[in-house]
């Protein structure tokens, strides 16, 4: 089968990745290695999110997506889930005003129905409304998100015939397809993350556990992306 018209090779490596998604793996292992609680690991991970977001701005990233909480995460222990949800609420309350001042647009991605608490939904809506006019970087935060769930939800509402019509039914239709997906802790799987959007994304696996993933690691991942030749189903010339 020949490639479609959209399967055209980009003949030159891009100077930088503008649209980046990160799977933040390793908070629990990081905490265990240090004799800390899992909650401590998640707190360290949350602090690292803020630091890498600011690095992404400096490095010319226009859209950054960082997995916060998946639909599968509800199956973890009640204690861990409660701690994660509480931390997420605190993060929105504390960080949104500062991120707004820095020109960050916040966009939460995922189902906003039960079991997500109403108070979390209200916080997400507040943060989105406050930062809606910002354009320095868009920070997509998948919460209660699953790639299969997103596709199923879109399919239920779909009455069109084209991919573009289908895309408009995704949780964040304005999101560009990530050019680069980074996963920490050495793992090499998508874990139900942005399944529609990552069809042609480049994948970079880093050995660092997420709390240890620093600016140098981010720069190294971006440099690896810049060395690659993206073919989109075509052949190298």
Model-inferred region functions:
Residues 1-237:
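Flexible, compositionally biased loop and terminal segments
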């Amino acid at each position: 089968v020949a490639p479609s018209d959209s399967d055209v090779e980009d003949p030159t490596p891009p100077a930088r990745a503008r649209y980046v998604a990160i799977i933040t793996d390793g908070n629990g292992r990081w905490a265990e290695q240090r004799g800390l609680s899992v909650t401590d690991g998640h707190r360290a991970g949350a602090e690292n999110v803020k630091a890498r977001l600011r690095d992404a701005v400096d490095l010319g990233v226009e859209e950054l997506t960082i997995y916060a909480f998946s639909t599968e995460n509800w199956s973890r222990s009640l204690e861990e889930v409660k701690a994660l949800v509480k931390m997420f609420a605190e993060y929105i309350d504390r960080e949104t005003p500062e991120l707004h001042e820095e020109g960050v647009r916040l966009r939460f991605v995922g189902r906003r129905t039960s079991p997500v608490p109403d108070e979390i939904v209200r916080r997400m809506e507040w943060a989105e409304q406050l930062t809606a006019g910002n354009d320095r970087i868009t920070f997509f935060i998948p919460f209660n998100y699953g790639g299969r769930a997103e596709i199923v939800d879109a399919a239920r509402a779909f009455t069109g015939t084209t991919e573009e019509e289908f895309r408009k039914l995704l949780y964040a239709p304005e999101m560009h397809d990530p050019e680069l997906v980074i996963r920490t802790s050495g793992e090499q799987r998508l874990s139900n993350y942005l399944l529609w959007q990552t069809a042609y994304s480049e994948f970079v696996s880093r050995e660092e556990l997420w709390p240890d993933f620093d600016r140098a690691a981010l720069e190294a991942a971006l440099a690896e992306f810049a060395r690659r030749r993206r073919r989109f189903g075509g052949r190298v010339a």
